[in-house]
């Protein structure tokens, strides 16, 4: 039997009441940033918020997730699509990789179409760095619409 891939998910604190429905649906369906786990068994070993700007919980939550076997940390799609998107997301990515040596993935569920439309109007993601950040969750329009 293949060993489970254990992951942690960090969401934006402004969504602290989020039940994770889109994240867990996309994990089950292997959509968005979870498509990387196609044909793999995955276990979520941690799900928490950053604790609000500037993200003080990131330092401690990742350590706990590692203690539960996490090999990858997903910075949830809410950090990417919020208005405004998280100003600390690239720092979180670099910090987790550097301090813990874990794989860090931008996003969880596919970007909903309504967010893509608005961010395109705003020009939010025109920068090459943002183009890299949205890539794992930028799926086809039909799928994006199911996440609206």
Labelled PLM ranges:
Residues 96-103:
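Alpha-helix-loop-beta-strand connector modules within alpha/beta enzyme cores
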